[in-house]
Amino acid sequence: DGGQSWKTISPDLTRGLPETIKSSGGPITQDNTGAEFYSNLFAINESPIEKGVIWVGSDDGLIHVTTDNGETWKNVTPPPTLSPKLNMINCIDPSPFKKGTVYVAATSYKFGDYKPYLYKTNDYGKTWSLITKGIPQNYYSRAIRSDKVREGLLYAGTEWGMFISFDDGNSWKPFQLNLPITSIRDLHVRDNDLIAATHGRSFW
C-alpha cells in the first residue's frame, strides 16, 4: 500500500553480540557518532526472477535468505574459512538470470583487514566461492552488481576504484577509465547505463 502500513517479516537476523552494541568511548565522555554500533541489517535485495526470495546481510557478518516472502529464514553465511566473523555485508545482488544465484560484497577493513571479499553462490547459499582474482589484495570491496542484459558480466566497486568481470567473477580487470581514484560506494545498472556513486567525488 505504498508504505502506508508495515509488518515485521523476520526475527533478528544479526548476531546481536552484547560486546558490539554497547556504548563506546568514555569513561567520562561517550562517543555520539553511532558508527561503532553493530547488529544492523546493512543490505537487502529481492530476486528479480523469483517471487518471495529475499536476501539480507548484516553489518556483523550474517547472510540470510527467505524463499517464502519472509515466513521463514535460513542462515546461509559463508563459512569462517571464507568470511571473517564480523565481515560487514555491504551489498547483495541476486542474479537476473539464474535462480539461487547471488553476488555479495563485504568488507572487514575496520579490523585492519583490507582484502576484498566478493562472493558468489549458485545454490541459495548452500555453498559459496570467493571471486576476487585480479583485484589487488589491499582494495577492499564496497559493491558488486550484475549486468541486466549480458549474463556473466559483473561490476565491482572497491575502495580504490572500479573492476569488471566478463566470466561471472572468475577473473577481474581494472575498469577505471577516467574515474577519479576514490572509493566506489555503490553501483546501479539502469537500462544501458552503469551509475557509480563515489565517496566525495560525485556520481558518474
Indicate where each model-derived feature is located.
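Beta-propeller blade termini and top-face loops
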Residues: D1-W204
